[in-house]
Each structure stands twice: as structure tokens, then as C-alpha cells.
A protein has these predicted regions:
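An internal, acidic/charged active-site-proximal segment
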Residues: 153-197
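Dynamic "connector" segments at or just before major functional cores
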Residues: 1-99, 103-116, 126, 135-146, ...
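Short, flexible coil/turn micro-motifs enriched in small/turn-prone residues
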Residues: 128, 135, 174-176
């Protein structure tokens, strides 16, 4: 199968063996890159009667429904740390260049515990939002993501990412590239502290 020949081995990073849940996750990733839509529209796009590409057939997802996609996202959330650790072990090492940035997105509805009013990049008045930080390797390939409450300042997200890279990923000496709004003098002091271990 073509998916199994992807150079980075994303299929194996997500789950070692072929399974429906792995195919659902891969299908959502590929569909999001090719033609981003809602989960309902994505499921319909996989369906044998409405598919606009062969993705549903290749991954055997022609009968997938929206609920299955949400279940796959819950499954993926439980695997997030393991997947991030694997990506970090493959693509980060001492001396690596790490790209870090923060953005936000507004929310519809009011069921998200992390949804708060904060600096709104989307210019959507009266909407709660979430903030998320993304760690990427030197080529811009994502390694890890963390979601924060919507009223979290960009600068306050950075220290936890330094800790994540140093402690969880075991990468002590790196070059961080981020924007000026994140790299404050107090964050710089934390960066230049001697690393234990």
C-alpha cells in the first residue's frame, strides 16, 4: 500500500500494525492536507457513493462515519505523548534547531474547558478561544503540540516547552527559533541556565 511507503513512516509511528483506527487517523491527516473539511464532510468524502478521491477505498474507509472519526481522535489523544516521543527521538538530537510558535483559534459553542477569552488573532468578537503551541524540527515538520487555555499569553507557554524538550525528549542543548513576542528576557534567562544531567 502507498501509505506504508511514506518515508517518515508515519503509519508505524501512529500504530505499529495496520488497523481500522490507524487507517481512520491516517485518512483524516491526508484529507486535512488535501482538502480540509469538517469531520462530517471528511467521512462523506470517504464514502463509496460520494468519494471525490480514492482515499476511502485505499484505506478501506468507505463505510466510515463521523462518530468513528471522533472516536479515532479520542484514541489519538491517548497516544499523543507516545507519538511525540517517537517523533522527537527520530528528528531531534543535541544541537538541533527547534522552531516554536503559538497561535489561537476561536471556538463555536461553550463545551470546551480550555476555551477562554483572550488575545484574539481571528478578530472574532465574543468568541472564546484556545491557544496552542507547536514544536517543529528544522524543516518545519511538527514534533509536538500543546493546547493551552484561551487567555494564556504566548510568553508563558515557552518554559513548559523548554522543559518538555529537555526532560521528556532528553534533548538538552538546542537552538530555539521563535518570535520576539515569546522570547522575553526572563525566558532567555531560563534558556541559558545550565542543564542538569
Amino acid at each position: 500500500m502507498y501509505i506504508e511507503r511514506v518515508p517518515i513512516g508515519l503509519d508505524k509511528i501512529i500504530a505499529g500494525k495496520t488497523s481500522r483506527i490507524r487507517n481512520l487517523v491516517l485518512g483524516m491527516i491526508i484529507a486535512r492536507i488535501i482538502n480540509p473539511k469538517s469531520k462530517l464532510a471528511t467521512a462523506r468524502g470517504f464514502h463509496e457513493k460520494t468519494c471525490s478521491n480514492s482515499l476511502g477505498k485505499v484505506l478501506n474507509l468507505e463505510k466510515a462515519d463521523e462518530d468513528e472519526l471522533y472516536e479515532a481522535l479520542d484514541w489519538l489523544l491517548n497516544k499523543q505523548e507516545k507519538i511525540e516521543n517517537k517523533l522527537a527521538s527520530l528528528y531531534l538530537d543535541n544541537g538541533s534547531l527547534i522552531l516554536y510558535d503559538v497561535t489561537s483559534t476561536y471556538l463555536e459553542g461553550n463545551g470546551c474547558e480550555l476555551g477562554k477569552y483572550g488575545y484574539n488573532r481571528d478578530k472574532k468578537k465574543g468568541k472564546t478561544q484556545i491557544v496552542f503551541g507547536l514544536i517543529c524540527d528544522k524543516n518545519g515538520c511538527p514534533i509536538a503540540v500543546e493546547v493551552f487555555e484561551g487567555n494564556t499569553s504566548d510568553t508563558s507557554t515557552f518554559l513548559s516547552q523548554i522543559e518538555k524538550v529537555r526532560k521528556r525528549f532528553g534533548v538538552k542543548n538546542v537552538v530555539w527559533v521563535t518570535d520576539r513576542g515569546i522570547l522575553t528576557s526572563s525566558n532567555i534567562k531560563e534558556l541559558v541556565k545550565p542543564v542538569e544531567g
